[in-house]
Design a protein with these regions (language model features):
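Contiguous, well-ordered alpha-helical segments that form the cores/surfaces of helical PPI scaffolds
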Residues: 1-3, 249
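RNase H-like nuclease fold core
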Residues: 3-12, 16-123, 219-227, 243-244
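Residues on a specific face of well-ordered alpha-helices
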Residues: 24, 28, 118, 136-139, ...
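A generic structural signal for short coil/turn motifs at secondary-structure boundaries
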Residues: 59-62, 137, 260
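Short, surface-exposed amphipathic charged segments that create phosphate/polyanion-binding patches used
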Residues: 65-68, 144-156
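Acidic/histidine-rich catalytic cores and adjacent linkers
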Residues: 103-131, 156-313
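Inter-helix linker motif
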Residues: 127-149
């Protein structure tokens, strides 16, 4: 039933599968689940290459607009590791929840990537280094220059230049066996890009682009975290929140089909179910094995199936 709820909309669930249950009944199944108390095991930052967090709007009871917030890790193999989802919960409380699960008590060389969401500037600063999403960074500059009175045709060259400066490509392969000249090439591009951004800030000030200068100045120290980490450790970390945005699209599509108007707890529960089923299938299957008391002491194998012919056809 739960997997059917996650995979389809209510009308198709009822009509296509002959399941006699009301939308309120589905809500009660979800809200009665203990999924919110599950998956609280410790997380090792050492296994991750990045952590991301963001929020998105959801429609709730009586037309009220709520906020669904999620935190995910990205493993070194590039897989999504769900860390938590929360509905109408303040970022400091979310941070406390995530910190309680993190095993390491000291800073680790991974970035925390975010798109500039208010309240996230120092999120998990004890264990990760802040990195602004490079895609959102350039997009935000366009809006700041628009506030300074620049139309798109005049601000586009500046945003294109920022994209070029922060788009440093890192060499693939084992960091330890890379040629020193390859490492020096990256370091040189990194240093020259930072210098050019400082020059651009100065130019903005001289031209009276106060919003653009202020935005770029606040952003400049948070755009190259992935490069700095690579130069120190050789770990190639993400630099955008694209994986998290893809997750929100998956959750949003399903919430609109089945969970519009639901309570905070129900939205939190169904979003956790979606995240875990989508990205942690082994944990999802183990959860239901434990719930159903399946110990795995034996296997059932169907060798063949014979269907007798029907006399009426």
């Amino acid at each position: 039933m739960i997997e059917s709820v996650i995979d389809t909309n209510y009308r198709r669930l009822i009509d296509g599968r002959s399941i006699d249950i009301s939308l309120g009944g589905i809500h009660n199944i979800v809200i009665g689940s203990d999924i919110d108390d599950t998956f609280q095991e410790p997380v090792s930052v050492e296994d991750l290459s990045a952590i991301m967090a963001d929020g998105t709007g959801v429609k709730q009871q009586e037309g009220r607009k709520g906020e669904l917030r999620a935190v995910i890790g990205i493993t070194k193999a590039g897989r999504v590791e769900p860390l938590g989802s929360f509905t109408n919960t303040a970022w400091p409380e979310i941070e406390r929840n995530i910190k309680e699960r993190i095993e390491e008590a000291e800073p680790y060389n991974i970035p925390f990537i975010y798109d500039g969401e208010p309240g996230l500037d120092d999120f998990l600063a004890d264990v990760a280094e802040s990195q602004r999403c490079t895609w959102h960074g350039a997009r935000g500059l366009y809006h700041s220059l628009w506030q300074d009175g620049l139309k798109k045709k005049y601000s586009q060259p500046e945003t294109d230049k920022i994209k070029q400066l922060i788009g440093i490509e890192l060499p693939k392969g084992d960091f330890e066996i890379l040629k020193e000249e390859d490492k020096e090439t990256v370091k040189s591009k990194y240093e020259s890009s930072k210098t050019e951004i400082k020059e651009l800030i100065k130019t903005f000030r001289e031209k009276g682009y106060k919003n653009g200068a202020s935005y770029l100045e606040n952003l400049s120290d948070l755009l190259f975290t992935n490069i700095e980490i690579w130069l120190k450790t050789g770990v190639i970390a993400p630099k955008t929140t694209s994986l998290l945005e893809r997750l929100f699209r998956e959750i949003g599509r399903r919430l609109k089909k089945i969970a519009w108007g639901w309570s905070d707890k129900a939205v939190t529960n169904i979003s956790k179910m979606i995240m875990i089923r989508q990205y942690s299938r082994d944990k999802w299957e183990q959860y239901w094995k434990d719930k159903l008391g399946i110990k795995g002491y034996f296997d059932i194998e169907i060798m063949s199936v014979n269907l007798p012919s029907c006399k009426h056809f």
